[in-house]
């Protein structure tokens, strides 16, 4: 069609007059991974239902680049609180402006940490417009064109901060009707003073589940995140019970969220062999080391530590590696916590991270130290300084989650250690 001086070609129309948009493939290829090797939840509060969830991100200039970074952080933080799997929650992420750019597709068989990494690297566009109609058309035909998981709920989280020109919105209502026919729930999140309230109200009128969240700006996203997750999680059905005993010990209900009457998402207790590694160098100091211990206690309190559930081992390291607790010792929460409280700071003038990782690879995760062959191997490493020695690649069956603390933590080094899992960075030991 002709729009002013611009001639635009479109794909042929589907029955009913709707135009099928061209396919825009995700930015990254889909690398398979083993679904049965779990990545542990990063937060106590998270959702584990049958859900296909699509994030639509406004890429217009109405959000500054800094504000768009906050928007991305909200998406990544939400993903951290979802049980992402082809068997549970699948996610797609699309940035929209005058067109639509898919960064993640529902069928992407990647580790959750890799999906979050891709989402965190979405480029800021800052275009003059962001067409809600175009991205809804894209989602209707390209993402939900074929319903391959009818047992799962289908939800779109529309993160919008701008208004499209009226000429682009002529089929807006028709797309909404298409979603209703396919039983797709559309949750608009209006951000800031320029969000299109008229379109948001139209979305709400289509179905009672299409609840809108109106925010004064991106700074409210984090405050409302758990409320939004809780709402969309309640829209989805429970996953069916497994036909044979899985690696999950049991399911417990997490604490409810204040101000929300419906039950919250659920938390799994995984069967894991977990080694906690704490830096205890002179650079860290005794006071900060003790804060690392307090953090360790809080994490263990939330775990299902038991003979049949999660097993814990603890190391501290600096110039040398000190073994504080092994998998062979009593695996009850009370015993582990008592020993953690008794750990004494060792100090040392080096940060031999490579030596610590080599030790746990060769010794901690060995049958002689109580490692279980059927349990996934996970490492949480708290460090605040660059390694003093060489770090060698660990076997593929050991997943390391580094927690870098303070300005001296080496980003590139920790990313190499953790790949494909994204390291966690915090400002200080407080």
UniProtKB/Swiss-Prot annotation:
* BP terms from Gene Ontology: activation of blood coagulation via clotting cascade; blood coagulation; cell adhesion; cell-substrate adhesion; cellular response to cold; cellular response to lipopolysaccharide; extracellular matrix organization; hemostasis
Q: Which SUPFAM superfamilies match?
A: vWA-like (SSF53300)
| Compartments it resides in | Secreted; Secreted, Extracellular space, Extracellular matrix
The positions flagged as glycosylation sites are 6, 23, 30-31, 252, 261, 290, 349
The reply on keyword Disulfide bond is: yes
Q: Name one GO cellular component term.
A: extracellular region
Q: Posttranslational modification, per the record? A: N- and O-glycosylated.
For this UniProt entry, the molecular function terms from Gene Ontology, in alphabetical order, are: collagen binding; identical protein binding; immunoglobulin binding; integrin binding; protease binding; protein-folding chaperone binding
Q: What does the record say about tissue specificity?
A: Plasma.
Q: Does the keyword Disulfide bond apply?
A: yes
**Key words, A-Z:** Blood coagulation, Cell adhesion, Disulfide bond, Extracellular matrix, Glycoprotein, Hemostasis, Repeat, Secreted
Recorded hits in CDD domains, A to Z, give:
vWFA_subfamily_ECM (cd01450)
SMART domains the UniProt entry points to: VWA
- Domain VWFA, which positions? 52-228, 273-430
Q: List the disulfide bonds.
A: 9-12, 47-233
Top-level division of the source organism's lineage: Eukaryota
Q: How does it assemble?
A: Multimeric. Interacts with F8.
What is the stated purpose of this protein?
Important in the maintenance of hemostasis, it promotes adhesion of platelets to the sites of vascular injury by forming a molecular bridge between sub-endothelial collagen matrix and platelet-surface receptor complex GPIb-IX-V. Also acts as a chaperone for coagulation factor VIII, delivering it to the site of injury, stabilizing its heterodimeric structure and protecting it from premature clearance from plasma.
Q: What name does UniProt use for this protein? A: von Willebrand factor
Organism from which the protein derives: Rattus norvegicus
Q: What is the lineage of its organism?
A: Eukaryota, Metazoa, Chordata, Craniata, Vertebrata
